[in-house]
Every structure is written in structure tokens, then in C-alpha cells.
């Protein structure tokens, strides 16, 4: 696989959802499909920022059962995670042979910009799907059937680019005892491998805990952390998600940047809200760093001011921060991450992250 191609959300109002991410996260309009392009079933607004592409889809009629069932059960959420691949037919054939449920067989769509080959299978959880995309013979910005004559957002003329570059990983949450079957599906069907894992002995707070396995494709350009709750005194944030999403689904999307301080400063100025981190986290961090040979290039006072978390080992470090939920329900949120020679997933920050989310769970009456 060549990486993530795009992520598709099914939402109640595609125009308004896309506009939110344009205004708050600094995305730009990329493409549109709807009545004006001959699509009588769905309106889809596609936005982008550097190599990140997100599509938001809503139906144009009230008789689409799949959409109605999805919204009745889940509400707004990620419907499809698409991968950029070189050989759609081969990956699809191997996946179906290994037990994947086909949604749409390999097919080509074309316009004046060229040809795109696509195929879709069900993922191992919920109604979420995976689409394989080969755009090697396509010069357009997204897909045939879309118009690229879309308005530039006025905010882009008065605000600076945020600097989010690509999708680093996509995280899904599952009910207890469901993580391992999902991991095994990715190993068997897509030939992914186990890249990283933690269990409840490592990741726990006073009240709750989790288990997580990250699976990756052969190139390790696609990474999918898979979480499940573990037994605790109270309800974990993983179980809270499963309860409110009414099943397994995508919990958060991590967006990679090369300058997290600049990106978070701009996102905050745009109105994005983030989880807060207590001062004790940074006091403890400074003490630990005194006994480490690792040099953090960024100013710790600035990281503390912005509530950015740090995880590190002897070779490098990562900086990460998590938005508050972007839906009314405690389901989807985003992570902003900067990697400095570090391929981990912030295991050292899981406890702090869990405690921050638990403080919010308590205000929601869900802890």
C-alpha cells in the first residue's frame, strides 16, 4: 500500500460538516459531487490539506436505507477508510479469497483527467468499509464524477496555513474481547502485521484501562491502532465510545505535522479546543528528562502552555495533542502528531490522556 488515500464520513449535512473543518482546521475545498454534477442520490463535499483528503457525504433523498440505518444506529461518523494501492485487482482478490466480504468489485471510472480503479470490501467491524484506490492513471485532484470548480474559502485569504500534512494513523474502538478477532482479520485478509501493542497492565488509571494493538501494512505507511476496554472500576473512554456510537467504529484520526507548536497555535486561534493536561505532567516530565540523554528541540514552556504531550525513548520523541470531541456525542476526535525519529504511539502518555478524558467523562456523567 502507498498510504491512506482518503477518509469518508457519513453525516447529516455534508456542506456544514465540510465547512466546519475548513473554518476550524484550515482545510480547503477540493471537489464536489451532487445534483449539479448529475448525482441524484448523494451530495459529497471533499476537502483537503496537503496530502490529507476527507469527504463528507449526505443523501439527497429520504429512501436510502443503508444511510438511514447508519445514521439511526451511529449518527455522524467515519464510513470508509480508503487506501492508495498499486494493484486493486490483486489486493481485492486476495482479500476476498481470505474471507473478506465484497461491497463492490474492482471497476474503473474515468473522465477527461484519466482513469481510477476502485474496489470496496467490508472492514472487520461495524458498517465501516475499506476502499482500494489506484489513481496512477489519473491527473485529477480526487475522482471522476466530481467537479473541481469549487469556491475558495474566504478565510484562506486572512488566515495562514495550519500545516497538517498527512494521515498518520486511524484508530478504531471495539467492545471487550473483540480486539483480537479484528487484529487477526487484518493479518489474514490484508496481510498486515502487528506493529506495536500495549495491554491493561501498562495502560490503566485508578478507574479504567485499555488494550491496544497497532496493525500495519507491509510498507508501514498504513497503521491502524485497534483498541478495546479492559475491566476497571468504572467505564473506560473506549466503552463510552462503543456505547454512544452503538458499536465499533473509528474513534480518532491522527494528522501529522512537521511543526506542532505552530499548528496548534493556529488551530487554537481558529477555535479548536483540546484536552487539558495538568501542570504535574510537565513537572514530572522535566524531572525524567534530566536523566535522559535525549534533547527535546522544542521549548518545554511552550509545549506546556499549549498542553502538548511528549513521549520519548533513547532514539527520539513524538509530540502529540488531542482535540475534544468534534461531535455532540463522545465519539470522534482528532490527534495532531509530530514525529522526531519515533514510530511509537505515545504509550507514555496514555495514562495522562486517559485521565484527561476521564475528567470530561465525569462532567458528562459517563464515568
From Swiss-Prot:
Domain VOC: 3-135, 166-324
Enzyme Commission number, as recorded: 1.13.11.27
Reaction it catalyzes: 3-(4-hydroxyphenyl)pyruvate + O2 = homogentisate + CO2
Enzyme class: oxidoreductase
Residues that coordinate or bind Fe cation: 169, 252, 335
Transmembrane segments: none
GO biological process, one term: L-phenylalanine catabolic process
Pathway: Amino-acid degradation; L-phenylalanine degradation; acetoacetate and fumarate from L-phenylalanine: step 3/6
Keywords: Dioxygenase, Iron, Metal-binding, Oxidoreductase, Phenylalanine catabolism, Repeat, Tyrosine catabolism
Pfam families: Glyoxalase
Cofactor(s) needed by this chain: Fe cation
CDD domains: HPPD_C_like, HPPD_N_like
GO function term, MF aspect, one: 4-hydroxyphenylpyruvate dioxygenase activity
Superkingdom, natural source: Eukaryota
Cofactor remark from the record: Binds 1 Fe cation per subunit.
Family annotation (InterPro entries): 4OHPhenylPyrv_dOase (IPR005956), 4OHPhenylPyrv_dOase_C (IPR041735), 4OHPhenylPyrv_dOase_N (IPR041736), Glyas_Bleomycin-R_OHBP_Dase (IPR029068), Glyas_Fos-R_dOase_dom (IPR004360), VOC (IPR037523)
Listed GO CC annotations: phagocytic vesicle
The UniProt record lists the keyword Repeat: yes
Function: Key enzyme in the degradation of tyrosine.
Family: Belongs to the 4HPPD family.
Protein name stated in the entry: 4-hydroxyphenylpyruvate dioxygenase
